């Protein structure tokens, strides 16, 4: 809904991580929600899109310049085999991040691609990324007791995202 508050937003680089049935209490339909996110793709000079998300892929036709990322082994920008790749070059091992979940590795990759689109070198921020503990209440491990890992994700708005990003039994 925050995009609605910025009708004249025209970023040089924008990104859409996913479009899932969330925040539907604010919209008449999922199509209306997707249209609100689509505006970002259209208004961005360069748009970084999640190539794993069918709804994001549908936006590509409307966007000007698209950079894709995802998890498919055929994607040049991907999270796969325990690492982040940009243009098929391994740049970071996922295990070097302090963040839980595949979604966080994908978020990091998206941010690195946005930096690159702005003309900055992703390698310059890798040391900081390795130290970043994440935000409070966002997929944070709080304890591990008798082989059970306890994760605080109390800021999450979509349980489906947690189910997808934490393949271990919950």
Q: Where are the regions that the model predicts?
A:
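Flexible active-site lid/hinge loop adjacent to a nucleotide/diphosphate
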Residues: 1-62, 68-69, 80, 92-99
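Structural motif
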Residues: 13-14, 46-47, 67, 140, ...
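Fold-independent oxyanion-binding glycine-rich loops
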Residues: 18-19, 50-52, 69-72, 88, ...
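Beta-strand->loop->alpha-helix junctions that form or flank phosphate-binding loops
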Residues: 50-51, 64-81, 126-130, 140-143
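Short polybasic amphipathic segments
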Residues: 82-88
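Residue-level detection of beta-strand-connecting loop/turn positions
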Residues: 88-89, 147
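Nucleotide phosphate-binding/pyrophosphate-handling subdomain across enzymes
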Residues: 94-170
């Amino acid at each position: 809904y925050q995009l609605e508050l910025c009708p004249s937003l025209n970023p040089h680089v924008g990104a859409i991580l996913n479009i899932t049935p969330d925040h539907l209490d604010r919209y008449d339909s999922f199509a209306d929600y997707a249209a609100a996110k689509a505006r970002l793709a259209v208004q961005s000079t360069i748009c970084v899109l999640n190539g794993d998300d069918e709804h994001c892929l549908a936006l590509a036709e409307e966007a000007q310049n698209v950079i894709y990322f995802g998890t498919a082994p055929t994607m040049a920008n991907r999270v796969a085999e325990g690492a982040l790749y940009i243009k098929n070059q391994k740049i970071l091992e996922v295990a070097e991040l302090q963040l839980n979940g595949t979604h966080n590795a994908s978020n990091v990759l998206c941010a690195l691609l946005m930096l690159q689109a702005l003309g900055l070198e992703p390698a310059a921020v890798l040391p900081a990324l390795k130290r970043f503990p994440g935000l409070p209440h966002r997929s944070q491990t709080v304890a591990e007791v008798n082989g059970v890992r306890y994760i605080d994700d109390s800021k999450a708005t979509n349980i489906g995202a947690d189910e997808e990003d934490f393949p271990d039994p919950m």
